[in-house]
Amino acid sequence: MFIGLFVLKVTFLNSRGDIQVPYRRLPKTDTARLKALKTLLDNNDTYTVRERFIDWKTINKAQPAYDKLLTASEQYKVNLKAQTRFTGKIDKLQKNAMMYISHFLQVLFLAVERGEIKRSCLTLYGLDEEASAVPHLKTIDGLLDWGQKIIAGEKARLKQGGRPIYNPTIGMVSTHYDIYCEAIERQRILQDRVNDSIEKLRLLRPAVDEVILDLWNQIEHHFVNEPPETRFNHCREYGIVYYYRRHEPHIY
């Protein structure tokens, strides 16, 4: 008869006479899952005919489970590292794009104040005719939205015969804006890869946990009649991890 899902009882008492039970717990992290499987797979006694007691079907499931989880875990780390590294670069590009758009708008407002550009032209940029302050550009959506409007507005005004704004020119604004847009798209692709990696890991874990649980049940069942002082050591050699509750003595 197989041992229960999580707890293996140990016979020793605390000061109140309660039975103390070190308990096993299925791994909570992918690193712990991989370690549990690798410990078993690296144990030569797992495979020898004389020593083997684990069902071959379960052993044959353990190696693919380990390989798939390891591959998915490593791919997640690679994708996360790439996404994190790129985030540092995009911050600078965002700052540059925001600075050029903000400076362009400030020059535009000054030209309106001096009467060099009609107030009615502000609507070409998506602005109210009475606008005199730079709109909010500190969010990604705000910067992308206003950048597009400002570039389109300046081009429309120039087509109507207006004089171009300098320092910065709309060409400089457009260049930094386009670079930022490309970076945002790249970041989204990298984030999608991270999300895909997370989803693959999420889908793999239940099957891996099922294999580990089956293995641990068979291992504990095999050593169930041995005394605790040897039973736990044997089980640990096959990858089972035991925990003690707070203030419990680490006897075995």
Ranges and model annotations:
Residues 2-252:
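Basic/polar low-complexity intrinsically disordered segments
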